[in-house]
C-alpha cells in the first residue's frame, strides 16, 4: 500500500484525519510523546518552572546544560514532523476523493490546523526550520533542505488559519467533540500574532474567541481538571482520551510519588520549589499541588506508616527526623484531579488551549495597546476565579502603574494559572524575560553560572541525528549550545 492507493474513499481520508489527531500524542509503546509529556520538557522545563530529579536528559534541560543529543529534542522534532508529513499527505489526496465540498473543507481545515500547530511548536523551539507543505516522495532530498525563516513560515500559517476559521465549525458534538474548531484556529492565529507583538491583529482573533459565546470559565478552577468534566466549557482545544483505549499516561509522569490517593505514579515531571514558593499564600492555586502528605508505602518492616513528604522552608536542608523526606520538586494536581481510573493508561484529557489562557492574552494585548487600566479587568478575572487576591482590591496588590509593571504582573499570572500547560518558555521569551528569570532561577539553585542563559539560547540546537544529515542544521548548532 502506498500514498497513491491508500486514499480512495471518504472513509479512508476520514481515518487518516483521526490518525492525525492521534499523532499529537503518539503511541509507539509509550503514550507519553509530544503532547503526552515530552512537549513539557522543551516548553515549561527549560525555564524556572520545572525541576528534574531524574538523571540524564531531563536534568540537562531543567538546569540548562543540554546538548544536541538530548532525546527530548530528537523525539519532539520527529513527532512534530510526523504530524506535518501526515497532514501533507491528507491535503495532497483529499481533492481526488469522491465526497462533498463541505466534507472536503472539514478535512482540509483540520489538517491545516494541526499542521499549523506543529509548525508553531517547531518555530517556538528551533526558529528557522525546513518548511515542507506537500508529500516528500524521496526522503533523501531532505538531507540538504534549507532552513526557512520564521517570518516566511508564519505567512503561510496565517493564511492557512484564516482559511480554517472560515471552513471549520464553531463546535462539534458526540465522539467528535475534541476536533479542531473556528475557536481553536482563531486562538492559534491570535497567538502567532502575539508572538510577534502584533497586538492589533492579535486582538482581532483573540476577541473573536472571547466574543464567540462558545466558551465559559468554570466557576471552580479545579473542575477544569476533573475527569468528570473531560471536555468542559473552558476547553478550546484539547486531546481527549479514554482509559480503555490505551490512551495517555500523563498521570503517571505528572502524578505524585508514593501518594495514598494517587498510587503508582512517578513524579517524573515536577514543578521547581522556588516557583511553587512564589505563589501567594492566599492563592488557592498554591494548594493544587501535592506538597505535604504521608506516603503510601511503609517506611520499613517495623512500621505501619509511610514517610512524611513535605517541602522544606527555603534554605533548610536537614530533615527534622528519620520519618520525614523533603521533596526536591512538587507534583501538580492538574493531571490527577478527580481520578476515575487507576489504570496505567489513564485516559486523561490533555489541554492545549483553554479560555483562561485567552483571557490573559487579552490582558497582554490591552496593556500594550491601551495601558494598565484596560488590562486590569482581564487580569483580575482570572485571579478572581481562582480566589486569589485581586489587584487594586488588596493592599498587597496595588494596580500596576505602568505598562512594564502590568506586563510583569500578567507574566506572573500566566505562570501561576497555566503551570505545566506548555506555555512558560514561549511566554518568557515573548515578554523579554527569558534570560533574566532563568538565570536568576539557576543562580538561586546554585547549579549554573548566573550568565548561563544568553540571547543565543532563544532557540534550541537542532537534533544531533538530523544535523549530522543536513549541514544547514549543523552549521547553526554551535551558537545554540549553553556555554
Stretch-by-stretch model annotation:
Residues 1-36:
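A short, exposed helix-loop element centered on a Lys and neighboring polar residues
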Residues 5, 17, 25-28, 46-79, ...:
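Elongated scaffold/linker segments in the mid-to-C-terminal portions of large proteins
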Amino acid at each position: 500500500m502506498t500514498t497513491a492507493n491508500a486514499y480512495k474513499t471518504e472513509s479512508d481520508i476520514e481515518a487518516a484525519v483521526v490518525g492525525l489527531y492521534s499523532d499529537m500524542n503518539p503511541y509507539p509503546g509509550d503514550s507519553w510523546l509530544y503532547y503526552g509529556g515530552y512537549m513539557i520538557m522543551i516548553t515549561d522545563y527549560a525555564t524556572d518552572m520545572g525541576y528534574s530529579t531524574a538523571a540524564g536528559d531531563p536534568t540537562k534541560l531543567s538546569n540548562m546544560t543540554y546538548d544536541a543529543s538530548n532525546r527530548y529534542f530528537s523525539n519532539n522534532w520527529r513527532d512534530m514532523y510526523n504530524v506535518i508529513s501526515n497532514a501533507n499527505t491528507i491535503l495532497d489526496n483529499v481533492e481526488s476523493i469522491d465526497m462533498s465540498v463541505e466534507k472536503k473543507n472539514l478535512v482540509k481545515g483540520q489538517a491545516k490546523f494541526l499542521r499549523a500547530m506543529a509548525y508553531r511548536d517547531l518555530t517556538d523551539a528551533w526558529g528557522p526550520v525546513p518548511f515542507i507543505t506537500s508529500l516528500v516522495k524521496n526522503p533523501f532530498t531532505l538531507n540538504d533542505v534549507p532552513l526557512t525563516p520564521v517570518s516566511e513560515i508564519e505567512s503561510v500559517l496565517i493564511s492557512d488559519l484564516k482559511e480554517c476559521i472560515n471552513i471549520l465549525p464553531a463546535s462539534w458534538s458526540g465522539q467528535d467533540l475534541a476536533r479542531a474548531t473556528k475557536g481553536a484556529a482563531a486562538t492559534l492565529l491570535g497567538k502567532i500574532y502575539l508572538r510577534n507583538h502584533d497586538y492589533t491583529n492579535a486582538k482581532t482573533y483573540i476577541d473573536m474567541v472571547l466574543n464567540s459565546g462558545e466558551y465559559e470559565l468554570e466557576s471552580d478552577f479545579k473542575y477544569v481538571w476533573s475527569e468528570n468534566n473531560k471536555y468542559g466549557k473552558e476547553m478550546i482545544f484539547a486531546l481527549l482520551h479514554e482509559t480503555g483505549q490505551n490512551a495517555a499516561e500523563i498521570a503517571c509522569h505528572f502524578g505524585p510519588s508514593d501518594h495514598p490517593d494517587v498510587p503508582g505514579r512517578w513524579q517524573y515531571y515536577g514543578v521547581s520549589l522556588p516557583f511553587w514558593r512564589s505563589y501567594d499564600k492566599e492563592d488557592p492555586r498554591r494548594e493544587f499541588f501535592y506538597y505535604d502528605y504521608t506516603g503510601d508505602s511503609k517506611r520499613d518492616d517495623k512500621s505501619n506508616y509511610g514517610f512524611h513528604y513535605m517541602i522544606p522552608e527555603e534554605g533548610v536542608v536537614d530533615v527534622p527526623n528519620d520519618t520525614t523526606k523533603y521533596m526536591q520538586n512538587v507534583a501538580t494536581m492538574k493531571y490527577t484531579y478527580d481520578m476515575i481510573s487507576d489504570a496505567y493508561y489513564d485516559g486523561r484529557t490533555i489541554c492545549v488551549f483553554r479560555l483562561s489562557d485567552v483571557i490573559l492574552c487579552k490582558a497582554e494585548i490591552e496593556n500594550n495597546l491601551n495601558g494598565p487600566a484596560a488590562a486590569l479587568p482581564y487580569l483580575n478575572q482570572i485571579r478572581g476565579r481562582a480566589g486569589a487576591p485581586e489587584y487594586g482590591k488588596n493592599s498587597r496588590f496595588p494596580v500596576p502603574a505602568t505598562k512594564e509593571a502590568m506586563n510583569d504582573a500578567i507574566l506572573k499570572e500566566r505562570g501561576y494559572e497555566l503551570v505545566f500547560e506548555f506555555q512558560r518558555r514561549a511566554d518568557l521569551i515573548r515578554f523579554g524575560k527569558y534570560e533574566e528569570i532563568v538565570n536568576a532561577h539557576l543562580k538561586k539553585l546554585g547549579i549554573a553560572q548566573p550568565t548561563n542563559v544568553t540571547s543565543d539560547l532563544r532557540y534550541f540546537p537542532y537534533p544531533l541525528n538530523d544535523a549530522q544529515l543536513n549541514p544547514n542544521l549543523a552549521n547553526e548548532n554551535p551558537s545554540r549550545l549553553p556555554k
